[in-house]
Amino acid sequence: MKTTPNTIEDAHQSLLQSHGQGAPSGSGSPLQLTNCPWCGHEIKPGRDVKAETFSNGRARVFTFCGDALGACDFSAAKAPGEGLPIVTVDEEIYRRLPDLLIATVDKFAQLPWNGKTQMLFGQVTGECPRHGFRSPCMDDSDSHPASRFGHPAVKSIAHGPLRPPDLIIQDELHLISGPLGN
C-alpha cells in the first residue's frame, strides 16, 4: 500500500497516471482500499476513484464501491456525489475534518511544521460550502464563482472552533488490526 497524497492535485496526478496519462508521481495514491468495506466488491483506481480539483469542483477525492450493477449503497450509481465516507488526502482531511482519524507517527510529526494541522484540533475560522472548513493558514478566497461543472457560486461563512476528533496514532500502520485494519 502506498502512502497517501498530500494534496488533491497530487491525488489527481496519481489517478491520471493509473489511467496511463500524466507524469509519474511519487506522492502516494488516494486508493487505500482494495475492496468496498460495505459489500466486498473490488475497487479499481481508474474506475472507482475520482478526483475533483479546486479548479473543476469541490477539491475532493471520491472512492466508490466497484459494484458495476450499482446495488451497493456506496456505488457511483447510488451515491454519485459522495461514494464511501472516507478521506485519504491530507488537504481534504484538513478541510473535511473527520470524526475519526487514523494516522502514522510520520503524519502526526507534521503538526509543528504545518499550520493547516491546527484545523484537526478544531481551530477553524470559516466554512466554504463547496470546499469545507478554512483557517488563516490556507490559501483560499472567501468566495468562489459558479463553476462550469455545475457547482453554484458560494461564499464562506464565519465558523467558531470545533470539537477535535478522536485520534489513533500508530508507529507502523500495518500493525493496526481489527475491523479498521487487516
Where are these regions (language model features)?
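N-terminal helicase ATP-binding lobe
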Residues: 1-182
